[in-house]
């Protein structure tokens, strides 16, 4: 399901809803009229328009634009970039997953926290002016059909590794990169981080987030340098100690960092976890403790990590795969509980079901596919993240968890959504998260899983 949201001071004056055709109308104190319609026939259409009637005795006014909110429980993938846009929602048809591909034919879209701003967050209107957004949707079983609706000039990858270049074939369009005119179809390499690409065509401007990603070891090494420079075992966190342990394995931190990590973990584990503590932070603390305790021949640290891990809820994503790893590495030491064949509960987090399917060897299952979808890597990225569910943007933490869960998914295999290989999707997610302005220690740690 989807709905249209408008801000104050719009007032709803008409609402007609049915299974096949729904329409709404709002008025603004300045005299502007906003209408929206969702119509289902051979294709599904979403139309939204704003009009300032002629003869209104007012100068140009700015009014809030309408926001399309995909509020389905299953995450929708969004690429809203100005003159072009694509949204892929998920539905169920005859007990088989299906995709609804929404293509923007008119409008000036952008991704906001609630969903898709159809005409911009603020719209300037003079008497006699109007603005129109039109999206058309169709069902498909293959994400490849959605990708075929992307602009032909769009680079194959919008976030790449250093020192790669990207190519934007736009013979009849103007190009701006970070606000400066660009005369070549080849872009980059640019400094590490996110950049703005704007393409000006007759239909309008398309704004694309592009980026150059650091490699994972470089990102981890930079963060670990910060941790070591101000190291205090009384204030460090479990995820930070995981990063220290990982950095030594990546050879971007000295071996002495392991001893510091042990000291930090002993301090963290000297206190019980609080009810307000982040689940992933607790998870990483436990895993760092049992792994580091085993490596450093510290049975007390190892056993405390295992004990705490087995106390964590299996209803939270990440617990199951952590127990799998512990059981594989320390088979004779883990607590003797029956837990591998736990049955999925009603209303359980789909990511938990995906984790259980993947880590019990059922990658070719509908449950496992959920982790592939939550990588958020099928469409080009947008600022803030590309997935939306139940009226809000899905957090980066979910993508980082999905990246960790799919570590054991054979890279050459695909999913039921279509042809992109899971290994390629995981790399896209990794690059997207690494170019984020600020990546939490928990998220960065999950990327080293």
Where does each model-flagged region fall?
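Non-catalytic terminal regions with compositionally biased, polar/charged low complexity
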Residues: 151, 166-171, 177-178
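Terminal, non-catalytic domain-edge segments
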Residues: 143-160, 360-449
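Extended, loop-rich substrate-binding clefts of extracytoplasmic carbohydrate-active enzymes
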Residues: 1-49, 111-120
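Extended acidic/polar, glycine-enriched regions
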Residues: 172-219
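Beta-strand-rich recognition/accessory modules
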Residues: 29, 61, 66, 86-160, ...
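Low-complexity, Pro/Ser/Thr- and charge-rich linker/hinge segments at domain boundaries
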Residues: 144-165, 206-239
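Acidic (Asp/Glu-rich), glycine- and aromatic
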Residues: 25-32, 39-82, 206
């Amino acid at each position: 399901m989807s709905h249209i949201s408008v801000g104050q001071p719009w007032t709803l004056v008409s609402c007609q809803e049915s299974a096949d055709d729904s329409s709404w109308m709002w008025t603004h104190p300045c005299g502007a009229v906003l209408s929206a319609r969702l119509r289902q026939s051979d294709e599904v259409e979403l139309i939204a328009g704003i009009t300032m009637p002629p003869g209104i005795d007012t100068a140009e006014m700015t009014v809030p634009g309408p926001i399309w909110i995909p509020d389905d429980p299953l995450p929708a993938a969004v690429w809203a970039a100005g003159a072009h846009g694509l949204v892929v929602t998920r539905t169920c048809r005859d007990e088989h997953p299906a995709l609804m591909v929404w293509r923007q034919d008119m409008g000036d879209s952008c991704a906001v926290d609630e969903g898709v701003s159809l005409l911009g967050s603020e719209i300037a209107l003079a008497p006699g002016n109007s603005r129109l957004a039109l999206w058309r949707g169709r069902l498909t079983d293959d994400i490849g059909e959605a990708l075929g609706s992307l602009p032909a000039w769009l680079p194959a990858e919008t976030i790449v590794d250093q020192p790669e270049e990207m190519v934007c074939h736009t013979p009849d369009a103007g190009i701006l990169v970070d606000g400066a005119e660009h005369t070549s179809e080849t872009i980059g390499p640019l400094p590490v981080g996110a950049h703005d690409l704007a393409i000006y065509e007759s239909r309008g401007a398309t704004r694309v987030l592009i980026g150059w990603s650091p490699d994972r070891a470089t990102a981890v090494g930079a963060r670990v340098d910060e941790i070591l420079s101000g190291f205090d075992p009384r204030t460090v966190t479990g995820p930070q100690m995981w990063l220290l342990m990982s950095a030594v394995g990546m050879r971007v931190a000295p071996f002495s960092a392991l001893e510091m990590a042990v000291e930090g973990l002993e301090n963290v584990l000297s206190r019980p976890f609080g009810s307000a503590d982040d689940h992933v932070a607790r998870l990483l603390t436990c895993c760092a403790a049992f792994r580091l305790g085993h490596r450093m021949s510290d049975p007390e640290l190892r056993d405390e990590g295992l004990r705490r891990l087995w106390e964590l809820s299996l209803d939270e994503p990440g617990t199951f795969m952590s127990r799998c790893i512990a059981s594989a590495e320390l088979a004779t030491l883990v607590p003797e509980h029956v837990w591998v064949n736990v049955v999925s509960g009603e209303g359980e987090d789909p990511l938990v079901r995906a984790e259980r399917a993947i880590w019990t060897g059922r990658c070719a299952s509908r449950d496992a596919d959920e982790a592939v979808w939550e990588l958020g890597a099928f469409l080009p990225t947008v600022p803030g993240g590309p997935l939306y569910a139940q009226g809000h943007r899905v957090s980066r933490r979910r993508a980082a968890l999905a990246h960790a869960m799919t570590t054991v998914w054979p890279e050459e295999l695909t999913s039921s959504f279509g042809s992109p290989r899971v290994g390629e999707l995981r790399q896209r997610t990794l690059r997207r998260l690494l170019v984020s302005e600020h990546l939490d220690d928990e998220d960065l740690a999950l990327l080293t899983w």
